[in-house]
Amino acid sequence: MKSIVLLRHGESIWNKENRFTGWTDVDLTEKGVAEAYRAGNLLKEKGYVFNKAYTSYLKRAVKTLNCVLDRMDQDWIPVEKSWRLNEKHYGSLQGLNKSETAQKYGDEQVLIWRRSYDIAPLPLSEDDPRNPRFDIRYKDVPDKELPRTESLKDTVERILPYWKEVIFPTLRTADQILVAAHGNSLRGIIKYLKNISDEEIVHLNLPTAVPYVFEFDDDLKLVNDYFLGDPEEIKKLMEAVANQGKKK
C-alpha cells in the first residue's frame, strides 16, 4: 500500500483575521505553528516515514511542512517547492475581510467568489504592486502564466499538470509522500482524485493542519481516503471553515 498525505497549512495571520489571502505571503499564527506540530505528532504516532515532500512558494505552507518534519525527525527528506501549489489567487479581494465583504455584497456572492468552480473575483490591475510579476520569487515564471485572479477551475488547471507529471509519478518509487499546500490548491487535487463534480466541490471544506490520507494499491489505483484525527472534532473544524465567508 502506498499513500499520499495532503495537508493544508496551519492557521495563518489572515486566517485569524478572516481575510482573503490568496498569494499574499502571510505567516502562521502561534496557533498555526501548534497545529502543524500537532499534525507532525499524529503522523509520527501513525508510523509515517515520508520519502519526499512537496510544498508551495508561500511561507505558511513551507513553515507548516518544516514544523511537521521537525516533529517527525524527518527534516532530512528531499523537499520540492513549486509555485503551482500556491493557493488560488483571489485577485482584488486579497486583503479584504470576508465577513465585511459579505455584508457589502451578500453571503451568496462571497460564496461564489470563494468556492464556485469557474467564476473568478475581479483581477488585480497590471500595475498593482500585488501582481505576482513584481515578486522576485516568480522571476523564472513567464508573465503570461502568472495569475492576477483565479477561479477554482483556473487553479485546478495550474495544479494538475504538476500533480500528474511530478508528484504522482513519485509513487512509483516511493511509498509515502507528503504535500503541504493550501485549501483551494488541495481541493483541486482532491476533486481530480475523487472525481468530484463542479457543483459538489463548492461544499468541500478543508480544516487547517489536519492530515488527509489517500491510499493507493501497487497499481496506483486509489483504494481509500480518510482524515487522521477525531471525526467529531474534524467535523466542527470543517463547519468553522464553511462559516468564514458569512455575515456576522
Swiss-Prot record:
Highest taxon, organism lineage: Bacteria
GO MF annotation terms: phosphoglycerate mutase activity
Keywords recorded for this protein, A-Z: Gluconeogenesis, Glycolysis, Isomerase
EC number: 5.4.2.11
Record-annotated site: Transition state stabilizer: H182
UniProt keyword Isomerase present: yes
Reaction equation(s) it catalyzes: (2R)-2-phosphoglycerate = (2R)-3-phosphoglycerate
Keyword Isomerase: yes
Pfam family, one: His_Phos_1
GO biological process: gluconeogenesis; glycolytic process
Residues annotated as catalytic: H9 (tele-phosphohistidine intermediate), E87 (proton donor/acceptor)
Top EC category: isomerase
Residues that coordinate or bind substrate: 8-15, 21-22, 60, 87-90, 98, 114-115, 183-184
Task performed by this protein: Catalyzes the interconversion of 2-phosphoglycerate and 3-phosphoglycerate.
Family: Belongs to the phosphoglycerate mutase family. BPG-dependent PGAM subfamily.
Protein name as annotated: 2,3-bisphosphoglycerate-dependent phosphoglycerate mutase
